[in-house]
Amino acid sequence: MTWKPIICLAALVLSASAIPVDNNVEGEPEVECGPNSITVNFNTRNPFEGHVYVKGLYDQAGCRSDEGGRQVAGIELPFDSCNTARTRSLNPKGVFVSTTVVISFHPQFVTKVDRAYRIQCFYMESDKTVSTQIEVSDLTTAFQTQVVPMPVCKYEILDGGPSGQPIQFATIGQQVYHKWTCDSETTDTFCAVVHSCTVDDGNGDTVQILNEEGCALDKFLLNNLEYPTDLMAGQEAHVYKYADRSQLFYQCQISITIKDPGSECARPTCSEPQGFGAVKQAGAGGAHAAAAPQAGVEEVQAAPVAAAAPVAAPVAAAAAAPAVPRATLAQLRLLRKKRSFGENEGILDVRVEINTLDIMEGASPSAPEAAALVSEESVRRRATSTGICLTPIGFASFLGIGTIVATALSATIFYVARPTSHKH
């Protein structure tokens, strides 16, 4: 009858002596942004016995590094694999290459000392100036250019509606608001149009939900966008997820164009989307999430030449051109600005991530109801944990002792309360 308390005592001793893995990351990760890949190295306090892998791709070949015996652990990730995402930026001008890397110190499990890092490299596009020498026999007209910074854009998923807070976690069916916003230092200068939106699970399964014109493809996933201002777009939606994945990665393109004076920004003309019209993209794991590395570098280096070439021409033209009205000069400057936007010059990428909780059994509750259920369940567990647990033998013993005590108490009360007999 004494074996159960002994086992419980042993369990308490084991839980008290359990300690975390005796290792951790020393300092910050060392990131090397190469021309074809990103290399991440970690310095550890003790010799490393574990794994370094891309989040969500533990079992994919080439996306995990198994290290052992050294105090340095690392991994090299090519641009065209392992869900390495590439996003274009107009301000600052260049390309962001990003991924999430996990360092795990246990050979089999994720423990409390493990860490996940969001790694990002920025490849800036350098500006090149093309000049030429001319001989002028008469008075020349100076040419002055003022550079207007491009807008800075972001993509957010808000809770409930346009005024909600950005969220990273949601339940299936929860109402959210997809919001695209561009901030500009000037007013009435630029127009923004959102298009080419996709959603993927981080493992190559990519579905297009907005086409190249900015029209919705599946009304159950996302409806046609609304444009409250020149540089803002949004639409309400409900949270969904892949069958066996909790993460969703949304990526869209935003086209920035010059706004014509006195006119409205052009918006996509879209018909009402049908249900189940989203297009699954074949082979999107590497091509969409991360474009070919060398092509990305060539794009960064070659674009400034095409953008800067028209600079020299106005100088020569201005020397020989007669005086023209100020309004005509303004129109010419506007045309020059538009011509400076070459192919893909005014297009940038925005990306956002959301984690979804799986569907609950029975009726599907809303987010507040789900929170209430979780709170109620925790209260029930706390109330249960304050009770007394007995084995069947212990319960029988407790019941027997209680019966004896109750019988003795009843006999005592009967003896005390009985009437006193009188002698005759």
UniProtKB/Swiss-Prot annotation:
<feature type="topological domain" description="Cytoplasmic">
    <location>
        <begin position="414"/>
        <end position="424"/>
    </location>
</feature>
<keyword id="KW-0677">Repeat</keyword>
<dbReference type="GO" id="GO:0042302">
    <property type="term" value="F:structural constituent of cuticle"/>
</dbReference>
<keyword id="KW-1003">Cell membrane</keyword>
<protein>
    <recommendedName>
        <fullName>Cuticlin-1</fullName>
    </recommendedName>
</protein>
<keyword id="KW-1133">Transmembrane helix</keyword>
<keyword id="KW-0472">Membrane</keyword>
<keyword id="KW-0964">Secreted</keyword>
<dbReference type="GO" id="GO:0060102">
    <property type="term" value="C:cuticular extracellular matrix"/>
</dbReference>
<feature type="signal peptide">
    <location>
        <begin position="1"/>
        <end position="18"/>
    </location>
</feature>
<feature type="disulfide bond">
    <location>
        <begin position="197"/>
        <end position="252"/>
    </location>
</feature>
<dbReference type="Pfam" id="PF25301">
    <property type="entry name" value="CUT_C"/>
</dbReference>
<feature type="repeat" description="3">
    <location>
        <begin position="312"/>
        <end position="315"/>
    </location>
</feature>
<dbReference type="GO" id="GO:0005886">
    <property type="term" value="C:plasma membrane"/>
</dbReference>
<keyword id="KW-0193">Cuticle</keyword>
<keyword id="KW-1015">Disulfide bond</keyword>
<feature type="topological domain" description="Extracellular">
    <location>
        <begin position="19"/>
        <end position="392"/>
    </location>
</feature>
<dbReference type="InterPro" id="IPR051962">
    <property type="entry name" value="Cuticlin"/>
</dbReference>
<feature type="region of interest" description="4 X 4 AA repeats of A-A-P-[AVI]">
    <location>
        <begin position="302"/>
        <end position="323"/>
    </location>
</feature>
<dbReference type="Pfam" id="PF25057">
    <property type="entry name" value="CUT_N"/>
</dbReference>
<feature type="repeat" description="4">
    <location>
        <begin position="320"/>
        <end position="323"/>
    </location>
</feature>
<feature type="domain" description="ZP">
    <location>
        <begin position="32"/>
        <end position="277"/>
    </location>
</feature>
<dbReference type="InterPro" id="IPR001507">
    <property type="entry name" value="ZP_dom"/>
</dbReference>
<dbReference type="InterPro" id="IPR056953">
    <property type="entry name" value="CUT_N"/>
</dbReference>
<feature type="repeat" description="2">
    <location>
        <begin position="307"/>
        <end position="311"/>
    </location>
</feature>
<dbReference type="GO" id="GO:0005576">
    <property type="term" value="C:extracellular region"/>
</dbReference>
<feature type="transmembrane region" description="Helical">
    <location>
        <begin position="393"/>
        <end position="413"/>
    </location>
</feature>
<comment type="function">
    <text>Component of the cuticles, which contributes to the formation of extracellular envelopes protecting the organism from the environment. Plays a role in alae formation in dauer larvae.</text>
</comment>
<keyword id="KW-0732">Signal</keyword>
<keyword id="KW-0812">Transmembrane</keyword>
<feature type="repeat" description="1">
    <location>
        <begin position="302"/>
        <end position="305"/>
    </location>
</feature>
